Amino acid sequence: MSRPASSNPPGRSPLRRGALTPTLIVVAVAVVGFIFFANVWTDVLWYQQLGFFEVYIRENLARIITFLIGFAMMFAAVFFAIRIAYRSRPVYAPDAEARDNLNRYQAQLEPVRRVVMIGLPILFGLFAGSAAASQWQKALLFFNQEPFGQADPLFNMDISFYLMSLPFLGFITGFLISIAVVAGIAGILTHYLYGSIRLMERGIFTSRAAQIHIAVTGALFLILLGVNFWLDRYTTVQSNSGRWAGALYTDVNAVVPTKAILAVAAGLVAILFIIAAIIGRWRLPVIGTAMLVITAILAGGVYPWVIQQFQVRPSENTLEKEFIDRNIKMTRAAYGLDKIDVSAYNATTTATTGALAADAQTTANIRLLDPNLISSAFAQLEQYRPYYQFPQTLNVDRYMVDGKVQDTVIAVRELNPDGLSANQQTWVNRHIVYTHGYGVVAAKGNKFTADGKPEFLQSGIPSNGVLGNDTSYEPRIYFGENSPEYSIVGAPDGAPNREQDRPAGREGGGETQYTFSGNGGPNVGNWLNRILYSIKFQSSDLLLSDGVNAESQILYERNPRERVEKLAPYLTVDGNAYPAVVDGRVKWIVDGYTTSQYFPYSQPQQLQNATVDSQTSAGRTVALPNSSVNYIRNSVKATVDAYDGSVNLYAWDDQDPILKAWQKVFPTVIKPYSEMSGDLMSHVRYPEDLFKVQRELLGRYHVTDPDSFYQNNDAWSVPNDPTVSEAVKQPPFYMSLQMPDQEKPAFQLTSSFIPQTVNGSARNILYGFLAADSDAGNVKGVKGESYGKLRLLELPTDTQVPGPGQAQNKFNSDPTVSQALNLLRQGASDVLNGNLLTLPVGGGLLYVQPVYLKSTGETSYPTLQRVLVAFGDKIGFAPTLDEALDQLFGGDSGATAGDSDNNGQTPTSPPGTTPPPAGPTDAKADLKAALDEANKAIQDGQAALAKGDFAGYGAQQTKLSEALKKAIDAQARLDATPAPTATPGATPSATPSPSPSS
């Protein structure tokens, strides 16, 4: 017998073709699984290397456990709802038509029944598990909560109940209600599909089993709804639906009682459902449900509305007074404003001779270097190589210099791989050769050189200065704000150095090589780790390069802020990490906050809105995330070592209950602040973002009287930054300052207030001045007594003290200042306004603003040329702050500024005064000669830059500065003559170019 011819193509069997699809699926699953494993295992290696494996384990265990619980609860509820409905299906129908329909439905469903009965619960379980896993922090806080020792004014519950119990209980209740609803719908649909529920002409037929199932599900839903109503009573103190946060008159007298009534009513209706399940009659539960809905609408919605509209609104100021008082007190407590020192400050506007004598120390420390503008000067003078860079905004700190505290503008010289030339842009160069920056650069905040350059305290390569040298501190910067994504470092003993370390000299002195010797990252010396990291970073070069050896480490997650965020996911991290030389190392200091949005009666704040200012809007610092909080504490100070990336977390506010709860969750990762060295203590600052949030609240909450608060006639605003063109808030400023009640200056963070801005306009006069003490001392593990103290100076409401915007307008509109600035613009140069500082000295408020000159060349940088000062209606304008203050205060301010050593040139006449007469012909000749000198200096300077002659460029900048000073002096003499002539070639514009401030 002959076999039938096969229809398959020759050489291809059905088995091979049928096995291809499952093989591809298995391969795809294996690839995805291995990629997932690579990401998980590299995370394990990273946390282990840093000594924070406990964080990884506990966080992920919490996520996994909450996911599994959520998944299991939803899966079980939906699965058993479907299974019970299926098993209780009727075996026969009462009539032929119903039987035929039932058989047809069952025939269609039977092929997929098992898949649906398992797949549907799994699908809903995955959604539920994911939702539960996202609440892992609430779960951990609930099981590890710590008491506040303070009760809310309505229910007399400890604050911890609202911050750590209620959020979790609310989630659990809502989650269980969702499960009941989904399971109930799944059960009802199954009953319908299998005939237990049928739509008939006489009504709806429901089998006895379906009735019991629905009744039990309904009872469970109503019980959970009743619990939710009961918990809603407590959430009224967290409400933000009214004009003020918290439970107000209507909430206390209408909403809270109504919620209690609805909770009891829901429980009673649940009992009716249980009775219906037993006796099989549905009239009572249907009536009860209808009554519950009507009660919820009338008592829960209409009644509170009537109370609010017809009782509260006509007498709001009296009825809400008690609750406004609660809001004021609880808000101030939640934001750390309850212990602020408030002093009346009757500021004078009269600049009298010797007025600064009592503020001599403050005057000597007034900062002139603007950390926003001076970055390019650091780059031109200290960058040395194109593969180095400085941040756009530098940081302000303080160091001990010659036995005195010196305000300092500081930055680290970080690596910039994008600065490599095109033929250097190889994988080896970017990840193995060029791995780190080098050195700290710091300049005195209150001084500058004769030609307007920063006066450096620490500079050069090799690094040298008052902060140490290459042997006294580790200058290499492997971890920074602009470090490469990853670098491969390390080598066996005796292997040649491969890393580019630093230039051997300033000009063409070659390069030195180095090998990283610390413990900075996971080892990639074995093939498994190399493969896993190649997958993580999607780089075959990492796997195949001969630059990777048995001792190689991989450095990544190198940004200090992001590093701390990953190791402490329960913290909100400040937007500005700053470097400091501490105990022979460069350390990044990062502030961490514990926050909550559940503090009773506290006014919520959007963190992003509160922390936006002219620095964040320009991208110089990072604004906080767009999340709402109504409680914040600077609970943690973190340090990140710039060399090896090691991280230390210190419990700075060790009395914060939220931090205590997290310490119970992660008991070994947060150290007590008693372990902080004295050197580290001396560089701790009051954090900027916390200060911004607090000053935003103080605009209203400096008022503590409920009646005045209600009237809102004494609200303040943070002034806009007058040195930028956009309408954005002025940033706070770090400076050494002696407040009126202090015996000596302290490093402080400051801001000012003007009347409330209404519809975009406000009177720009000063109403308040806020300072936060940032002096933590220099003793190991001991905080300075005054650290964190907030001091607020309140000016009288009839004050005539100008605000920052008004002071800037005075500078811009003064004729003498305008003419001088026009002269500075000669020769294609820009005039840049530095930060406008406000200081409470001399019995009033002093404004100080440095004025920088920058030529328009690509390689130019700003040099400080003049200083503007204002006190009341008077202004001063001179080459140095010391001279400007003497002009302002009748020839003698009574104090010596930090730049007094730069004096020696003939001071220009103060604005508004008449210089001694001089012949116009001589003045015109002098002016022309000075302008010619300035133009020649600019041309010669640009030629020097083109040749790479930085020393020659610096010399020409000095000549330019001297020539412009001569020109200004000549112009002043011309203006004093009876018939002044036009300034040759003067630029008509008189307004200084706006620039960002710090």
Swiss-Prot record:
Residue stretches spanning the membrane: 18-38, 64-84, 115-135, 168-188, 211-231, 260-280, 287-307
Family classification: Belongs to the UPF0182 family.
Disordered: annotated segments: 490-518, 888-923, 971-998
Protein name: UPF0182 protein AAur_2732
UniProt source species: Paenarthrobacter aurescens (strain TC1)
GO CC field: extracellular region; plasma membrane
Basic and acidic residues compositional bias, start-end: 496-509
Membrane topology: Multi-pass membrane protein
Comp. bias (Pro residues): 908-919
Subcellular location(s) per record: Cell membrane
Keywords, sorted A to Z: Cell membrane, Membrane, Transmembrane, Transmembrane helix
Disulfide cysteine pairs (residue numbers): none
Record's compositionally biased regions (Low complexity): 976-990
InterPro entries: UPF0182 (IPR005372)
Lineage: Bacteria, Bacillati, Actinomycetota, Actinomycetes, Micrococcales
Entry annotated with the keyword Transmembrane: yes
